[in-house]
Structures are given as structure tokens and as C-alpha cells.
Amino acid sequence: MQGESTIARRDFLTTALTAASSALTIGLSHTDAHGQEPTHQSYTTTKSPLSFDNLYDTSVLATTLKGEAADRLALRRLVDAWAHCADRRLAEAQSNLFVPNGTIFNYEGDPNTHQPHSTIKGRAAIRSALAVLNTFTVTLHMNGQSDAIIAGDHAIGETYCVVHQFSEQNGQRKCQTLGIRYYDTFLRQESRWYFAERKLVIDWSDSRISVP
């Protein structure tokens, strides 16, 4: 069972599937190139404002909020969009949450004491890696506490997430639960927030037989 758990954890690391966050913050390493806030507008759409298609919009224009409040809402939507797309198997939309050359670094242990286990760079590679989700019958990503520091078009944040992954093996349903943290670097382009870099950290995992 330990060997199977380790393999499953490494498979998960290789694909970096999750969202999320924590009240702890990390030092800001980027500065604003322009030092100005974008002009905000109210969100308009040809669809009904109550359409489910309008959920998880990461644009600061998709709200009547202004300034930092609009940025924080968009960043939280971005984190939640990753979880939503993972569970709904929307690989194209999920990979597009990154800038074109965005990178995921996967860790099995704290980044301060461990080297990345694997690295995934670019939207195409991220999209390809997401295919591992199809090996599970169902997944559930539950985002927890999250915080961010914003400086112009740049931001950083930490996110906590608990992931449940169900699979069928030898006629039995199995569940693997992962405790994950994300250290994110964000970039705002044309009023929309994207992931520039994600450090996925698996703190713990548990595998067991699941009885419906």
C-alpha cells in the first residue's frame, strides 16, 4: 500500500492538478512596471448576468468593485477556477489560466528543504499533463484559506487545498486524499489575472478503501 501511495503521489505531482491557498504570506519578488491602477468598468455581457457561463471570470472588469478589491476577487476566482476546471475535466480552459510560458513546480515536501520533483512549462505541456485526471472516476478539490499581496500588475499568494481522488482497482473503490499548498506568482495582463508560476507542495497523503 505504501508503494502504491508513493507512486500515486508522484503521478499527481507530475501533473500538478489543484487550486488553493493560506493565510500565511510570502515575500514579494516582483515590482510593478507601471505603478498605475487600470481603469475599471462595470461588467457587461450579452448574456444574462445570472448565467453560469459568467462564473470564475478572472477579469477585474467582471465586477463593480474597484482597485484592490477587484484584484482580490479576480485572484480568488482564478484559484477557484483551477479547482473547478480540474473536477469538470476542462483541460483547455484550465491550461489557459496560465500565461503562455507559465510554469508549475511540483514538490513532495517543503520548498525550503526540498528540490522540485518535476517541472511543467507552457500551456501545451500543462494541458497534456492534465490527462491524468481521466484515470480517476471522480475528483473533488476543496480550497481553503488563501491570501495574496498585490503590487500593480504583479501579485503573489499562498493557498491551501484538500483533494479527494477516487479510482476503481481490482473491483474496489479507492480514495486518495492529499493535503496541498500552492505558492503562486500572478500576472495581470489586459485587466485579467493569470498564473505565472505555481509551486505545488504536497504536505501529506492518505490512501484507503472507499465504501459507497
Q: Where is each model-derived feature located?
A:
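N-terminal acidic, proline/glycine-rich, low-complexity intrinsically disordered segments
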Residues: 1-6, 27, 36
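A solvent-exposed, acidic/Ser-Thr-rich amphipathic alpha-helical stretch
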Residues: 91-161
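A beta-strand edge to alpha-helix "cap/lid" segment located at domain peripheries
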Residues: 14-19, 28, 36-63, 134-212
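Aromatic-acidic/polar surface patches that form glycan- and anion
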Residues: 5, 68-71, 75, 87, ...
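Short, low-complexity N-terminal intrinsically disordered segments enriched in polar/charged residues
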Residues: 36-88, 92, 96, 100
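N-terminal secretory signal peptides and thylakoid transit peptides that target proteins
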Residues: 2-20
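Extracellular/periplasmic carbohydrate-active domains that bind, remodel
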Residues: 34-35, 62, 72-73, 78, ...
